[in-house]
A protein has these predicted regions:
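An edge-strand/N-cap motif at the start of beta-rich repeat modules
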Residues: 19-52
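Conserved beta-propeller blade signature
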Residues: 21-28, 97-101, 147-151, 205-209, ...
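Beta-propeller fold detector
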Residues: 48-76, 118-129, 168-184, 224-233, ...
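Repeated scaffold domains used in trafficking and secretory/extracellular systems
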Residues: 62-65, 75, 79-90, 127-141, ...
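Bacterial Sec-dependent N-terminal signal peptides
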Residues: 1-23, 309, 333, 379, ...
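Residue-level detector of functionally pivotal "anchor" positions at catalytic/ligand-binding pockets or at interdomain
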Residues: 288-313
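C-terminal outer-membrane/trafficking sorting elements
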Residues: 305-307, 312-388
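Blade-level signature of beta-propeller repeat domains, shared across WD40, Kelch, NHL, RCC1
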Residues: 254-296
Length: 388
């Protein structure tokens, strides 16, 4: 893995970040079968449930992007926004959307966590049949590039869900194959590699946590799955069905069978049980965080922010409404290597600023915006994604 030389503030930010909804669970009913109950916020540090976002009994407002109209779905089918067999979940923080798929359907759903409006993305790329366990989409996560990724059980489909303008686009990136050194710990075998969930790291690699507890690193360039090891410290016969990175950079895993959540250190795969709820049936987890990420967002002031964080028109807005902020500010844009690639001076008058900043010559990708005051104190550090 590449070693980046980051400015000191990148190692320290995040300590003052306020609590927010950034970690979510797909929760089932108390039954041995997969039966969808709700999407909910959850505390990724202690395993305690928060606000319920959407349930199996909620009124579903579904808009089909293909048909450009609202649709009424048949709840008795496998292809609806509240199907009983949902097993994948990802979180897109740039739009506050939860993205998910029913396990036996090619439909992709995008649920806005605030408005509860749902966009249906129909497509002919996903090849799923209910009777073929190899084809079931069971792992999903947001990549560091801002796109959503999903993998079926056998690795024969590696899906990318991206947004072009106002439309979601689905692509199949190809077949993921076993690394030659995997031996008996095969990514493509039911007993060792199927099911579970996936997370992303800061270099847009992925880690699949299979139901067996085996962990595989997925190289997106080579489309290979390399066996990393097996989680230690979880109870015997624990089924790993959800995985997501928390705000401390640890991986939280959960089980569909009704069990405690565990926090896993990706460096050594050692786990410890979280003290929260001990019998949640969790089919998938999702968060805004990434493994090995030194660019975690932080904001020292509640009334200083930038928007949008997904930039598709080459500019951002800087907004200040805080009497304690005075004089000149410096906004610096860093790339993923920690290199300063752009600077802009900002002037605050009477604690107020609302300025549009043009991001010239920035190619698509992730960047960090750092804003400091005249003394050099960091007031804001926030990641943005530049897209077309």
């Amino acid at each position: 893995m590449k070693k980046h030389l980051f400015p000191l503030f990148l190692l320290l930010i995040g300590a003052n970040a306020s609590a927010q909804q950034d970690f979510f669970a797909l929760v089932g009913k108390e039954t041995p079968n997969i039966v969808f109950n709700d999407f909910r916020a959850i505390d990724g540090l202690n395993g305690v449930s928060g606000e319920t976002i959407f349930t199996s009994d909620s009124s579903a407002k579904v808009f089909s992007q293909n048909r450009n109209s609202s649709v009424t779905e048949d709840k008795n089918t496998f292809s609806n926004a509240q199907a009983i067999n949902i097993a994948t979940l990802a979180y897109d923080p740039s739009s506050n959307n939860l993205v998910y798929m029913p396990m036996f359907s090619s439909n992709i759903y995008v649920l806005n966590a605030k408005t509860k409006e749902i966009t249906l993305v129909e497509n002919d790329i996903v090849r799923v049949t209910s009777c073929d366990i190899n084809s079931h989409i069971t792992r999903m996560a947001t990549g560091y590039d801002g796109n959503i990724y999903a993998i079926n059980n056998s690795g024969t489909q590696f899906l990318q869900i991206s947004k072009k303008g106002n439309q979601y686009v689905v692509n199949d990136l190809g077949i993921i194959k076993d690394d030659l050194d995997n031996a008996k710990n095969s990514f493509t075998a039911l007993e060792t590699g199927f099911g579970g969930d996936m997370i992303a790291d800061a270099e847009n690699n992925f880690y699949v946590f299979s139901a067996s507890g085996n962990v595989f690193k997925i190289s997106t360039k080579e489309l290979k799955a390399k066996f990393v090891g097996k989680i230690s410290g979880i109870t015997e016969n624990y089924s790993v069905n959800g995985a997501a990175v928390n705000s401390q950079g640890k991986v939280v895993v959960a089980s569909a069978k009704g069990a405690a959540l565990y926090e896993v250190d990706l460096k050594n795969l050692q786990s410890k049980k979280l003290a929260g709820e001990q019998n949640l049936h969790i089919y998938d987890l999702a968060s805004k965080y990434f493994a090995n990420d030194r660019m975690t967002s932080g904001n020292a002031l509640a009334n200083l922010d930038i928007y949008p964080t997904r930039v598709d028109e080459h500019y951002i807005n800087v907004n200040v409404n805080d009497k304690s902020v005075k004089g000149k500010l410096t906004m610096t844009v860093f790339d993923l290597s920690g290199k300063s690639i752009m600077k802009q001076n900002l002037s605050v008058r009477d604690g107020s600023l609302n300025q549009q900043v043009y991001l010239k010559n920035l190619v698509n990708g992730a960047y960090l915006i750092n804003i400091t005051d005249e003394s050099g104190k960091a007031l804001l550090n926030k990641k943005i994604l530049v897209t077309e």
